[in-house]
Each structure stands twice: as C-alpha cells, then as structure tokens.
Curated annotation (Swiss-Prot):
Homodimer. This is Triosephosphate isomerase. InterPro entries: Aldolase_TIM, TIM_sf, TrioseP_Isoase_bac/euk, Triosephosphate_isomerase, Triosephosphate_isomerase_AS. The lineage of its organism: Bacteria, Bacillati, Mycoplasmatota, Mollicutes, Acholeplasmatales. It is found in: Cytoplasm. The gene is tpiA. Substrate binds at residues 13-15, 176, 216. GO terms for biological process: gluconeogenesis; glyceraldehyde-3-phosphate biosynthetic process; glycerol catabolic process; glycolytic process. Keywords: Cytoplasm, Gluconeogenesis, Glycolysis, Isomerase. It comes from the Bacteria. Belongs to the triosephosphate isomerase family. It catalyses: D-glyceraldehyde 3-phosphate = dihydroxyacetone phosphate. Its main location: cytoplasm. The keyword Isomerase applies. Its EC number is 5.3.1.1.
Amino acid sequence: MNYKPRTKVIAGNWKMHKCKDEALEFIQKVSLQVPDQTQVQTLIFPQLTLLDPLVQLQGANLQVGAQNMFYETEGAFTGEVSPQNLLSLGVKHVLLGHSERRTLFGETDQTVNLKLLSALKHKLVPTVCVGESLLTKENNQTQMFLDQQLTNIFAGVPEEALKNMIIAYEPVWAIGTGKSANPQDANKTIEQIREKVTALYSFQASCAIRIIYGGSLSVANIKSILEQPAIDGILAGKASLQTEDFLFFAQIASKQVLVSTKDIFQKNDCPFCY
C-alpha cells in the first residue's frame, strides 16, 4: 500500500447558510488567497442547491463537497441525492454522519456505514463524523463509545480506502454551543481514535488517514487546536462562514509542518503517527 504525507485540512460546513450570491462571492475571494493545496487542503460543504454553481469555481486550492448523500444510486427516495448525481456535478467530497443528521434526521451508525461504503464505491472522498454526547463524556465513556462507533461505521471498509478518507471528531456537546473541547483533550481523544484505527486495520493504515477536529472553533482558539500534534485539521461550522476567518484558519494551518509518512515510519518511538 502506498501512502502520501498527511497535509492539514481546513473544512467548512455551511449547514443551511448562504444564498447563491453570497456563496459565489465567498468562493471567488477565498480561492484567490488560500494556500497552495500541497500545504493545506481547503474544503467547503455548502447546501445542495449551491453545489452546481460553486463546483464551477472550485480549483486546486479550494474544493466543494456535499453535506450528505444517500447510499442507493437511484429510486423512490424523496428528498435524497445519489452519489452518481454528485459525481455528475463534479463533486468529489462528501460529509457523512454529522451529529445534526443523527439527531434531527434519525441517522445511525448503520446508515452512515451504508453511505460510507457507497461513497467509496463511487470514488467519492468521504469525511466521516464521529463524536460523543455530553452524558457520555460526563460518564467517562468517551473512548468506549467512539471505539464502538468506529467499529460500526467502518464495517466492511477495506484498508486501502483509508488513505482517501478523513475522520472528523466532533464532540456533540461542542457543536454550536460555544463550548470547544480543551485542545489537549481533543488531541488525546484523536490519539485514541487513531489507536482504534490501528486495532481495526494496521499501524500503516492509521498513519495514512487524516483525523480532524470540529466543535465551536473560532479565531481565538484555532491556533491552539492546530498546534496539537495529533490533529490534522478542522471542520468548522459557523466559524467558516466569514471569508476573513476561513482564510485565517487556512493561513494558520499552512504554518504547521507537513507530516511525512516516510518520517513517521522511521520514528518507532512515536505510537500516534505525528
């Protein structure tokens, strides 16, 4: 299996924000100023209706992805979008399993797994969300919960696919609440997620997959988050809506040292691949 170095990821989930004119203006401005893709990968996940016009403006430095997709290719599934439809628009990335999809629309680990398998089958690049509730955190069951969530979601996923995927750790209690995880705590949890990937697959596979953090990000805490050695980037919600803030996130990320997989394999004393 061949692996590429892990670059930082700066992703924005716009949720149900921005109309066409606002979105076009954002993409036009940001695409001219974001760092080179070899330094940091920048992604925007807009509403479904914005995909077509925004994909026309995406380039090497800024790409557009879908917030969701269904696992079937066609059929009587009112309100859903198929992976084939996304591909026909030129979409290459898709966000799967966001906690709002779970709490508001009844998605489960099993449906996320089906979507993940379908996305991989159709050569889409999935960003898969995982995260625990406040009750789980307060009961000190975060690691056990995430281990089971990862086991369920990754069932049937081949090891070879991991190098083209992203895991987004988004603690449910931190999404849209203004309560971001302590950077060191987020780093520790992402270390544990990588350990679980090692257990499910291999050390090499866990070194290949990128794991990012999301949850109440801001210009005030972005630097301390991205400085954490185990965190490969961010998935921002509200904080990604302002052009200046998104560019600031990308600029901070570009200053971080790229992680070379080759170097990782030479560091036998480093169990978490950073």
